[in-house]
Curated annotation (Swiss-Prot):
GO cellular component labels: cytosol
Domain tRNA-binding: 593-694
Enzyme class per UniProt: ligase
Cofactor(s) named in the record: Zn(2+)
Main location: cytoplasm
Name this polypeptide is given: Methionine--tRNA ligase
InterPro entries documented for this protein: aa-tRNA-synth_I_CS (IPR001412), Anticodon_Met (IPR041872), Met-tRNA-synth_bsu_C (IPR004495), Met-tRNA_ligase_1 (IPR023458), Met-tRNA_synth (IPR014758), Methionyl/Leucyl_tRNA_Synth (IPR015413), MetRS_core (IPR033911), MetRS_Zn (IPR029038)
Function of the protein: Is required not only for elongation of protein synthesis but also for the initiation of all mRNA translation through initiator tRNA(fMet) aminoacylation.
Residue interval(s) of motif 'KMSKS' region: 330-334
Length: 694
């Protein structure tokens, strides 16, 4: 075995504004399995997490309940920990981002970034609730969709037609908090200059720290150009005040990942561990983040950029997983498939049934996984009970009934028939299964383990110990003793391989077999001669389909959202739209200044790709009496062939600019934040090339 590795593992921090549901549990079960496997291998592996406790939703929910935010997050922390414990998620530390440890690290990192010139303040314009006297996040503004005119749509996207937009695009907007019409108000915000970290991030995202599909996804952001990141919010806000900026608070997505450091700092202080050994720039420890693919932007761009430029180490790997569907569809309250962890446990379902089923579906990619409730019942009953548990239940009773629970037998019968060949096969599979666990291909591990279980069951079916037990001669008793001993050794090996997934069942098996806690290395040994076992007790029951029906019924709710409570914010939407906040109007200029700009109608005579350029298209523009060549940064939004023949507006008297790819003789006008959201301006019908725009 290789020397022990020093490993720190995190899962994304659940938001302290709601219950844990089965979708959340995909990630925590995935992480817990991986951590348990590493610990079984003898590695020094620490697993930390925390509640994500800051932000406007926390503040407003606490206000609605008539309690302080601190009281709310303390209660939710207890609920989350209860649910995780119920599903056997075993953290080394489960903490809160609302801690002095996280506050100190946030202030430290902010100060280091500021010292390096990566923090900038600037005025922005946002919607403000004049009744509550607070700036409103996108999801706390509703109005009429500017495209399909659906009523009561959120401030960042329409759930009817799917259009995304800025809150200021809404028709007749109103505050979800007070119902008042919001007004635009200017405020100074603090920005992290993420764009200046682009070259580092391009290298880091291609370094092997990400899954291939994750790295490819991030390429889209690089092509669009990285925007500076707004890291501040205005009072009133529940969070950490920015040092030297009274009334300004760190945005929740700045201190949330720093919560990993805060939780680990708390663990270090309690156990006497060296924090710097894990987080310093040249650390030899391994750092792994398990996350959902919806927060990839924050963890794979914002977070490593912050760490790198504040003098800390970056993650060894980031493992992103897909979303959970139930019966092939999004979880639904009306269909009863938006199932909370608490409800699952209260309905009496075994948490290890779900751990096993998720393991059957999980792999090392970002693919979504589906919880088919019918398949869930069938697979657990067939695999766990019908194959695995069945092995012990069909043989253990004979050992205690006829042999006083003793397993002191040879592995070969008097007539020379060897029965230990299957033991070698199972032992030799340890490294293959180990590789699957390490790469998070749990579905492959399960497939292999169940193939081995099938072979063991074939062995038992061929030997028929229940038939042998009916015969009372000495040969039959000896044969029965060997068959049972072999079978229980095989059962023990299968238990080792399943232990990361089924820790409580493995504990029960350890008690039944009277053995210490199983490690991965134990796959190379057998139960010793003369070993005694306890009486067999039933290890697991089958799922009754009626239990699942009752679970669904218990979770069936109306689709109508709770009044005044917006749906949880989408980190993806926030990442894509935060730069769409209305920018302040530029400095006033005179009419004489504006008159200097010669705007003309131009027809795009030709458009083509520019070899070696990620963002540019080469446009040949017809101005009526002459043609111009312009290099325009619109490649991410337009295919060249779709532009040919189109009319647009250009700045005709802009000084020619010599570029790497040629001379650009003007500028076309477009709106939008960039990336795929670039909108080329077009004149109304009747305009002709060369006409002056007045």
């Amino acid at each position: 075995m290789t020397s022990p590795r020093k490993i720190l593992v995190t899962s994304a921090l659940p938001y302290a504004n709601g219950p844990i549901h089965l979708g959340h549990l995909v990630e925590y079960i995935q992480t817990d399995i991986w951590v348990r496997f590493q610990k079984m291998r003898g590695h020094d592996c620490r697993y930390v997490c925390a509640d994500d406790t800051h932000g406007t939703p926390i503040m407003l929910r606490a206000e609605k309940e008539g309690i302080s935010p601190e009281e709310l997050i303390a209660r939710v922390h207890g609920e989350h920990l209860r649910d995780f414990t119920g599903f056997h998620i075993e953290f080394d530390n489960y903490y809160s981002t609302h801690s002095e440890e996280t506050r100190a690290h946030a202030a430290d990192i902010y100060g280091r970034l500021k010292d390096r010139g990566l923090i900038e303040s600037r005025a922005i314009e946002q919607y403000f609730d004049p009744v509550k006297e607070m700036f409103l996040p996108d999801r706390f503004i509703k109005g009429e969709c500017p495209k399909c005119h659906a009523k009561d749509q959120y401030g960042d996207s329409c759930e009817v037609c799917g259009t995304t937009y800025s809150p200021t695009d809404l028709i007749n907007p109103y505050s979800v908090v007070s119902g008042a019409a919001p007004v635009r108000r200017e405020s100074v915000h603090y920005f992290f200059k993420l764009g200046e970290c682009a070259e580092f991030l391009k290298d880091w995202t291609r370094s092997g720290a990400l899954q291939t599909e994750a790295a490819n996804k991030l390429n889209e952001w690089f092509e669009a150009g990285l925007s500076d990141w707004d890291i501040s919010r205005d009072a009133p806000y529940f969070g950490f005040e920015i040092p030297d900026a009274p009334g300004k608070y760190f945005y929740v997505w700045l201190d949330a990942p720093i919560g990993y450091m805060g939780s680990f700092q708390n663990l270090c202080d309690r156990l006497g561990l060296d924090f710097a050994e894990y987080w310093k720039k040249d650390s030899e420890a391994e750092l792994y983040h398990f996350i959902g693919k919806d927060i990839l932007y924050f963890h794979a761009l914002f977070w490593p950029a912050m760490l790198e430029h504040s003098g800390f180490r970056t993650p060894t790997r980031i493992f992103a997983h897909g979303f959970l569907t139930v019966n092939g569809e999004k979880m639904s309250k009306s269909r009863g498939t938006f199932i909370t962890a608490q409800s699952y446990l209260e309905q009496g379902l075994n948490p290890e049934w779900l751990r096993y089923y998720y393991a059957c579906k999980l792999n090392g990619t970002m693919e979504d996984i589906d919880l088919s409730l019918e398949d869930f019942v069938a697979r657990v009953n067939s695999d766990l009970v019908g194959k695995y548990i069945n092995i012990a239940s069909r043989t253990a009773g004979f050992v205690t009934k006829f042999f006083d629970g003793r397993l002191d037998v040879p592995m070969q019968l008097a007539d020379g028939e060897a029965l230990d060949f299957l033991i070698d096969r199972l032992r030799d599979s340890a490294e293959e299964i180990s590789g699957y666990y390490d790469s998070r291909d749990y579905n492959k591990a399960i497939r292999k383990i169940m193939e081995l279980a099938d072979e063991v069951n074939i062995f038992v079916n061929e030997k028929k110990p229940w038939e042998i037990a009916k015969r009372d001669d000495s040969y039959s008793r000896g044969y029965l003793r060997v068959v049972c001993a072999i079978t229980l050794n095989l059962f023990r090996l299968l238990t080792i391989y399943l232990k990361p997934i089924l820790p409580r069942l493995a504990e029960a098996v350890e008690g039944f077999l009277k053995i210490p806690s199983l490690t991965w290395q134990d796959a190379q040994t057998l139960l010793p001669q003369g070993h005694t076992i306890n009486d067999y007790q039933h290890l697991m029951t089958r799922i009754d389909p009626k239990q699942v029906d009752a679970l669904v019924e218990a979770n069936r709710q109306s689709l109508q959202a709770t009044a005044g409570q917006p749906e949880p914010h989408s980190q993806v939407r926030h990442a894509e739209h935060q730069q769409r906040q209305v920018q302040p109007i530029a400095e006033t200029i005179s009419i004489d200044d504006f008159a200097k700009v010669d705007l003309r109608i131009a027809r795009i005579a030709n458009a083509e790709h520019v070899e070696g350029a990620d963002k540019l298209l080469k446009l040949t523009l017809d101005l009526g009496g002459e043609t111009r060549t312009v290099f325009a940064g619109i490649k991410s939004a337009y295919a060249p062939e779709t532009l040919i023949g189109r009319l647009t507006v250009m700045v005709a008297n802009l000084a020619p600019r010599k570029m790497k790819f040629g001379l650009s003789e003007g500028m076309v006008l477009a709106a939008g934040p960039g990336g795929g959201d670039i909108f080329l301006l077009s004149p109304d019908e009747g305009a002709q090339p060369g006409m002056k725009v007045k």
